[in-house]
Amino acid sequence: MPSLLGLKCLGKLCSSEIGKVPSPERASLRNSHRRLLIEDLSVPETPDPAHRRRGTVIHLVYLYSAGCGPPELRFSSYDPSVAHPQDPHHSSEKPVIHCHKCGEPCKGEVLRVQTKHFHIKCFTCKVCGCDLAQGGFFIKNGDYLCTLDYQRMYGTRCHGCGEFVEGEVVTALGKTYHPNCFACTICKRPFPPGDRVTFNGRDCLCQLCAQPMSSSPKEASCSSNCAGCGRDIKNGQALLALDKQWHLGCFKCKSCGKVLTGEYISKDGSPYCEKDYQGLFGVKCEACHQFITGKVLEAGDKHYHPSCARCSRCNQMFTEGEEMYLQGSTVWHPDCKQSTKTEEKLRPPNIPRSSSDFFYPKSLIRRTGRSPALQLLSPPCLTNSNKNPRQPTRTSSESIYSRPGSSIPGSPGHTIYAKVDNEILDYKDLAAIPKVKAIYDIERPDLITYEPFYTSGYEDKQERQSLGESPRTLSPTPSAEGYQDVRDRMIHRSTSQGSINSPVYSRHSYTPTTSRSPQHFHRPELLSPGVHRWSPLRTSSFSSTHSDSRPNPPFRHHFLPHVKGNEPSSGRNSPLPYRPDSRPLTPTYAQAPKHFHVPDQGINIYRKPPIYKQHAALAAQSKASEDIIKFSKFPAAQAPDPNEIPKIETDHWPGPPSLAAVGTDPRRRSSGREEDEEELLRRRQLQEEQLMKLNSGLGQLILKEEMEKESRERASLASRYDSPLHSASHAPSSKTSSLPGYGKNGLHRPVSTDFAQYNSYGDISGGVRDYQTLPDGHMPAVRMDRGVSMPNMLEPKIFPYEMLMVTNRGRNKILRDVDRTRLERHLAPEVFWEIFGMSIQEFDKLPLWRRNDMKKKAKLF
């Protein structure tokens, strides 16, 4: 009996219409994943052909949906009679299904995604490798990702709840929400689709919650208009800012026109971006000169960042509401200011500056009848000899200038005078100074009383009228008798003021504040027998009969021009021409001093170098005099070579001492010891004076150490000359030599930087040498202490730990007898062990950086 057709590999690809994937990039909840089931069916052979029947094969197709529970079962049927018998030529034409990932042919259960087929084990996530057949998946750039990896790499979080957003989303103001998370801030109700949302810059409000914000019916009626463009806000989002509603694109910066989406600053009802607001209305910090945003600290008319306002003393910031002192551009804490004042009181008193007296007297102007040019200007005097000696005084360290002199004939003029470094200068001297060298301290000259140099009284008017003086020319034409009378009166006046016939043609009056030597005046010699040189000019010095607020100057230079006949003394007109009979033609107004300048042939026509060059000349002159004094102490005024071996300083060199010389040694030694004791006493007094100025615990400690050392020195000096025979050649002097390298090594043990005295030769003259006697009774030739500090002779005082702590503000009270560099030394041993966990001896063995670090942690550094 013929057998039935055997179905060895009969199958059908089944699909569902629901399985259409709308998007190739993502399979969401609506997407279905198809599963293909290929079954091998075999029909048992039946010997009887009549028993052949039509059969129905049912295929189970699993339809998976992401997140929709268990897979759905779909049934599909087909008629096996339709299938062609399996013969070689039909089986070879069947297509072979290959896996898209591994490329192997698919047999059994396979998965189909769109047009691609996968083995079940090959369809996995690209990132984590998990099986995608049991859950939803996402397609990104051709890669298959699980839900967790896709959300982690490409997902968007809700701005309300912070979870990842899937499905329907709401986007507002650049932020994404779940539909249920985008709700009104006040009533917490979600916004329905198509509803209008009001954003006031901070909150999103619905229509019911935003309606009470309208303060008047007018505002309520106009609330639908944009404040920027004026048009009605219809559909879309509205922005509420500055109590107005705006389109999102109409809310712009008034200056640059940039759309404001984040923060803004309002000024006079207009919005600005931060950059433009700072450029137009910003306030800069006085410390860093940057614009201040946020909190600002105000001190007077100055503004600071809270982090920039720091105390100039302790460098700590000021807290809100804290008091401060403001001085110029520096600020202080009240406690720091008080401690500064305390330290200033402990310092040596500063020498007060000398007061600078400025006067603006009137100068007299005379015009001749021949030329309208001004001939002579009388310079001002430093004081007034006829008025009250009390003069207005201004304290200033530099120069001051006043209004310039008038050029109108007959009007009172004013010249510029200033006092710089105890020297009076006029305006031409000030003009000779470069601008970078001159410092002008402007004051109010109108507060100074102006007085003329010479106050004309009734008697002087009588003289001018008697001399025939006219108010226009001020040039008297006296007779011989009247002229002689005026001359005698002038000589008497000049003599009473301290100078007789002393013409001064220099315009530079020099008046220091202290007098060091008496004035010496020179009487000029006679030009010819019977003819005396006479000048109407007088010096600016005064006698003791006139009260003056300043002492006389130590030096005064007088320039005497040689006038012979009618020859002028310079290129200018001579103020006093002579007649052939050796008498002046027409004397000028002799009562007023007429100082004029005789130009030199050099470049500087003012005969005096500028101020900045005068200091160098004075310094060179002082150095020369110091060198003279220094070299006068050397034999033959020659300083010995420091590399040369010094000669033996004894009265008997090069021969041995005789008995007669030895007999005279005790007196000489006794006088030397007295001088040594006087020198030690003088040094001790000097040290005590310096330490009294220091007035600190460290200074008292140094003083005690020095006194103990000097007592040992005196004891050694008393027993130094036990052997009278060899004392002259081996006993060095205990005086400090000011000549290093000549007889002694010149090396001194430094006493202290606080009271070490320096002489003009540069060596220290406050220390006492430490000599140690050798076993044979001789003294060492050279002893040099290098890097050795003085021993601590006193036990440090014990203070509580709270008083020694260094806070951020510093100690409120400065403790006396405390070494600030070693605060830990003033702790009790048990307190020291409690803080540092070790003894003082163990602490000293640690390296310096370790000790400093431990002291910083304990607030003792």
Curated annotation (Swiss-Prot):
May act as scaffold protein. May play a role in the development of the retina. Has been suggested to play a role in axon guidance. It comes from Mus musculus (Mouse). Residues 374-414, 459-590, 634-682, 713-748 are annotated as: Disordered. Residues 673-723 form a coiled coil. GO terms for cellular component: actin cytoskeleton; cytoplasm; lamellipodium; postsynaptic density; stress fiber. Residues 381-400, 467-478, 493-518 have a biased composition (Polar residues). Keywords: Actin-binding, Coiled coil, Cytoplasm, Cytoskeleton, Isopeptide bond, LIM domain, Metal-binding, Phosphoprotein, Repeat, Ubl conjugation, Zinc. Residues 97-156, 156-216, 224-283, 283-343 form the LIM zinc-binding domain. InterPro entries: AbLIM_anchor, Actin-binding_LIM, Villin_headpiece, Villin_headpiece_dom_sf, Znf_LIM. Isoform 1 is not necessary for normal axon guidance. It is found in: Cytoplasm; Cytoplasm, Cytoskeleton. SMART domains: LIM (SM00132), VHP (SM00153). Residues 404-413, 536-546, 724-738 have a biased composition (Low complexity). The modification Phosphoserine is found at residues 216, 411, 466, 470, 475, 479, 496, 499, 502, 582, 671, 723, 738, 760, 789. One of its GO terms (biological process) is positive regulation of transcription by RNA polymerase II. The modification Phosphotyrosine is found at Y417, Y440, Y483. Its main location: cytoplasm. Residues 793-861 form the HP domain. The modification Phosphothreonine is found at T477. This is Actin-binding LIM protein 1. Isoform 1 is detected in adult retina, where it is highly expressed in the ganglion layer. Detected in rod inner segment. Isoform 2 is highly expressed in adult retina, brain, kidney and heart. Isoform 3 is highly expressed in adult retina, brain, kidney, liver, skeletal muscle, spleen and heart. Detected in embryonic retina, brain, spinal cord, peripheral sensory ganglia and thymus.
